[in-house]
């Protein structure tokens, strides 16, 4: 079954929603974003998060020491690097599960996968607005050219209305959603519920 990551949790309500709906992963954003949380906030959230839901930290071009501090204090299960990090940088985190985001404009971007040894690639849409969380989708057909030595986490513009089609086309390890389960910029319980049910109903 395809796994679900709900990204950008930033309120206690979001944690309560996750505890009820049990996504496989939840994401805390530590980069510049309207969904950004700091370590103090995240520590409070983690205290209230049910066991079994894996914690992902999202980072963009952060100093190694800062990432390590956050990862160790929160006991993060996955480090998601969404910026211009190199393999040399990623090698600092050999004791962690690492997902590397690749922003997709064309098939040429898939060549970047050859530069990394990571646990999964998160394919996201490219946007001039910034790194991730844009709510924009890309042409999933591009991923037909990807040779699947490393699992795929599909991101970018996913929502209840298109996630089934995306899964059937890409067959990812996991799907990642943020703005697609929000109303007015905040996580919405019913949208989260519908999205998770839709994903888990795909055969």
Curated annotation (Swiss-Prot):
Transmembrane segments: none annotated. It catalyses: N-(5-phospho-beta-D-ribosyl)anthranilate = 1-(2-carboxyphenylamino)-1-deoxy-D-ribulose 5-phosphate. SUPFAM superfamilies: Ribulose-phoshate binding barrel (SSF51366). The keyword Metal-binding does not apply. Keywords: Amino-acid biosynthesis, Aromatic amino acid biosynthesis, Isomerase, Tryptophan biosynthesis. It comes from the Bacteria. Its EC number is 5.3.1.24. GO terms for molecular function: phosphoribosylanthranilate isomerase activity. One of its GO terms (biological process) is L-tryptophan biosynthetic process. Pathway: Amino-acid biosynthesis; L-tryptophan biosynthesis; L-tryptophan from chorismate: step 3/5. InterPro entries: Aldolase_TIM, PRAI_dom, RibuloseP-bd_barrel, TrpF_fam. Pfam families: PRAI (PF00697). Belongs to the TrpF family. This is N-(5'-phosphoribosyl)anthranilate isomerase.
């Amino acid at each position: 079954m395809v796994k679900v990551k709900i990204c950008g949790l930033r309120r206690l309500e979001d944690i309560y929603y996750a505890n009820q709906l049990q996504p496989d992963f939840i994401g805390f954003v530590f980069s510049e974003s309207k969904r950004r949380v700091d370590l103090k906030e995240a520590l409070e959230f983690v205290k209230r998060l049910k066991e079994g839901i894996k914690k992902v930290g999202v980072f963009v071009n952060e100093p190694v020491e800062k990432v390590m501090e956050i990862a160790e204090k929160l006991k993060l299960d996955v480090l998601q690097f969404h910026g211009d990090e190199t393999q040399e940088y990623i090698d600092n985190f050999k004791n962690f599960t690492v997902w590397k985001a690749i922003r997709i404009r064309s098939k040429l971007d898939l060549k970047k996968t050859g530069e990394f040894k990571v646990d999964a690639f998160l394919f996201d849409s490219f946007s001039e607005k910034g790194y991730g969380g844009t709510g924009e989708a890309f042409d999933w057909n591009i991923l037909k050219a990807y040779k699947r030595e490393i699992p795929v986490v599909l991101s970018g513009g996913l929502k209840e209305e298109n996630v089934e089609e995306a899964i059937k086309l890409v067959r990812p390890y996991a799907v990642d959603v943020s703005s697609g389960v929000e109303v007015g910029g905040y996580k919405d319980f019913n949208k989260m519920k519908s999205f998770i049910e839709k994903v888990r109903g795909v055969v």
